[in-house]
Amino acid sequence: DVRELGADFLAFSAHKALGRMGIGVLWGRHELLDAMPPMLTGGEMIDSVTEQDATWASVPEKFEAGTQDAAGIYATGAALTYLTRTVGYDAVAARESALVPYLMGRMAELDFIDVIGPADASAHHGVVSFNVRGVHPHDVASILDASGVCIRAGHHCAQPLLTWLGVENL
């Protein structure tokens, strides 16, 4: 319950839960959303408009510019249903808890791989960031992709963190 958490906002990216890229959810306290101007403009978000002024629709409509991605919304619901009812979060956590130590152990055997973060596998929570010395991360991703292994490479929308870590890409 986000109200119990005391959160002002909660953002969710569907692709991080088996959903499609480019769709997500934003929950926010009504009074904060009401005070915010929309970032984008489009149909269905205007209550009234003149040549000089526009009055935004009420929350949430004032943030929903243009045509909604109906297929993406449906796909997100299906992905979440599959993840929660068929697979289950506990099963995902158990699988990650088994795979991460295995992966980190195998990587530790290779002197050309630098794992970013703590040596304790349980601190990685299902994500292992690494670099292969002398090879650009996008090349590593392409090579692994050819073997059926899917990873993400790049700056992961976290360039300040990468600068702090002393790396350009992962």
Predicted features by range, described:
Residues D1-L170:
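Pyridoxal 5′-phosphate
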